[in-house]
């Protein structure tokens, strides 16, 4: 790959580092060399060769306020000056405690106990451990399996992979290695899932689902009735319900949290990605008092034995508090509503193309699903040549822009997709 680096090879750090870096989701022998970035601002990525790209996916769905927002930057700088990090075992700091209180007040339902970690995958691992140990602490060891759903993706660590779709996901190499759980269809009605829970409910600790939008598994949508059915089935069969809002949380679907649209709340929720406005890594797993009370005991073996080294990192918590400030002060959800309209209008021409299976929009998520994409790397390069950064997955081209994107920038993104898909049809 290094001999393909082109202009970037003139930079010593790039040419030398390329011999040692292992990139994500990439076959290193064939993947095009990564683009060297020297600066970000707003929705723009500036490359080392001087080109500027409009980011259509907000750095994997994180930079909801755009890059380099001054309020977040100032909060992080102020925290850096006093305390960048201190371990969270036996010690406490203001940023984490304030953030926990704010999240508890913001979340729907009775989600009030906040456990911090450092990535979305780990937040899911914590949720799975909470759910399993909840039953163990109640003296029930047989409820140790999960119901997850086809098309779902929950992360790349072992437990998270095990509750992701083994066929449509990215972890087929681990078939037969990971723990086996129940992978079901999202219920259009109660019958199939009802039958599964009738037969196996006494072994199921929890169901886990991405509310309204399954992200990395293909950007598939489902409706609020599905979430209501899951809540009702969880209650009927005495299993817990986990909502993975790592992608959908913080306004992406048009409400602060996707589950608000269904009027139901889970027993456990996971958050990350836009939690810090895309500035720093941070995640949280939040549980109801029902869950927390199962761990509240004089018995030390009933404690939740988990502790990421950088959990509740002070810089990440400062960024998250600043991001929540912006949601309170700025019209972010109104901006998402405007983006919804622009995406529907801008992507509509794709519906007329014979190679397009579906065009769908939810909040600040716009999706063009194709019959197939033969060469993802070539397609990504075509977008870069048009001055936009769009990263298709599977057979899907999608947009998840910053909520602060201008109408002209968003039109540039949708025009690039329409032009490219039209060209693919020929």
PLM features: residue spans?
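Conserved N-terminal phosphate-binding loop of PLP-dependent enzymes in the Aspartate aminotransferase
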Residues: 2-426
């Amino acid at each position: 790959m290094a001999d393909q680096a082109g202009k970037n090879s003139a930079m010593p750090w790039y040419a030398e580092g390329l011999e040692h870096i292992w990139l994500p989701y990439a076959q290193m022998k064939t993947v095009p060399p990564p683009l060297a970035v020297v600066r970000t601002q707003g929705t723009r990525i500036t490359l080392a060769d001087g080109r500027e790209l409009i980011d259509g996916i907000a750095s994997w769905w994180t930079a909801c306020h755009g890059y380099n927002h001054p309020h977040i930057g100032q909060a992080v700088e102020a925290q850096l000056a006093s305390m960048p990090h201190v371990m969270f075992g036996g010690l406490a700091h203001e940023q984490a405690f304030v953030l926990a209180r704010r999240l508890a007040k913001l979340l729907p339902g009775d989600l009030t106990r906040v456990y911090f970690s450092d990535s979305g995958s780990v937040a899911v691992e914590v949720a799975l451990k909470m759910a399993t140990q909840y039953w163990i602490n109640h003296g029930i060891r047989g409820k140790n399996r999960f119901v997850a759903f086809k098309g779902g993706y929950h992360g790349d660590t072992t437990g998270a992979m095990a509750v992701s779709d083994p066929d449509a996901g990215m972890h087929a190499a681990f078939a037969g290695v990971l723990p086996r759980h129940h992978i079901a269809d999202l219920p259009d009605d109660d019958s199939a899932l009802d039958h599964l829970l009738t037969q196996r409910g006494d072994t199921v600790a929890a169901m886990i689902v991405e509310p309204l939008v399954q992200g990395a598994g293909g950007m598939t949508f489902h409706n609020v009735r599905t979430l209501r059915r899951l809540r009702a089935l969880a209650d009927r069969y005495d299993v817990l319900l986990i909502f993975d809002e790592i992608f959908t949380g913080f306004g992406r679907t048009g409400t602060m949290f996707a589950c608000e649209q269904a009027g139901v709340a889970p027993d456990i929720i996971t958050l990350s990605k836009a939690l810090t406005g895309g500035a720093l890594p941070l995640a949280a797993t939040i549980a109801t008092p029902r869950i927390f009370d199962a761990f509240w005991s004089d018995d030390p073996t009933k404690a939740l034995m988990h502790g990421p080294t950088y959990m509740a990192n002070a810089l990440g918590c400062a960024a998250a508090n600043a991001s929540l400030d912006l949601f309170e002060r700025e019209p972010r959800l109104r901006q998402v509503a405007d983006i919804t309209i622009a995406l529907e209008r801008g992507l509509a021409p794709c519906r007329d193309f014979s190679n397009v299976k579906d065009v769908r929009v939810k909040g600040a998520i716009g999706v063009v699903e194709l019959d197939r994409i033969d060469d993802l790397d070539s397609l990504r390069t075509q977008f870069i040549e048009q001055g936009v950064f769009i990263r298709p997955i599977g057979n899907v081209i999608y947009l998840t822009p910053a909520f602060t994107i201008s109408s002209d920038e968003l039109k540039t993104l949708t025009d690039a997709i329409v032009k490219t898909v039209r060209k693919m049809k020929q």
